[in-house]
């Protein structure tokens, strides 16, 4: 899997984790569900299903407007993060971290934005 370096550490993107999952389990399922959505805050759950068996879950929370990307895409960002975490819990792309490159990049951006305030 292709790695991205962020602040000196290697991370795997969610898209790379999904591609690897599809290679390993072409009939596997990645199911997502909104668990809560109110006042600009959203919580997603992602489930990884292999051969009809739930093998991993992941959750992610985002707040609308809490970062540059979340001003317009907090729903998509939360769903992507939940998928990345679920695939990580399944063991895909976790050589250096359970967090995906997407999550870490967003966190770094958020820290920079918070510092500007």
Predicted features along the sequence, with ranges:
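Polyanion-binding surfaces on beta-sheet-dominated domains and ring/shell assemblies
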Residues: 1-117
């Amino acid at each position: 899997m292709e790695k991205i370096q962020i602040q000196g550490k290697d991370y795997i993107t969610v898209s790379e984790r999904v591609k690897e999952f599809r290679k390993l389990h072409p009939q596997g399922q990645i199911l997502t569900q909104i668990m809560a959505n109110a006042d600009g805050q959203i919580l997603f759950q992602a489930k990884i299903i292999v051969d009809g068996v739930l093998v991993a879950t992941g959750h992610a929370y985002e707040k609308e407007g809490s970062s540059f990307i979340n001003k317009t895409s907090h729903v998509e960002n939360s769903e992507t993060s939940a998928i990345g975490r679920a695939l990580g819990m399944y063991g895909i792309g976790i050589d250096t971290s359970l967090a995906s490159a997407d999550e870490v990049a967003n966190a770094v951006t958020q820290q920079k934005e918070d510092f500007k305030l």
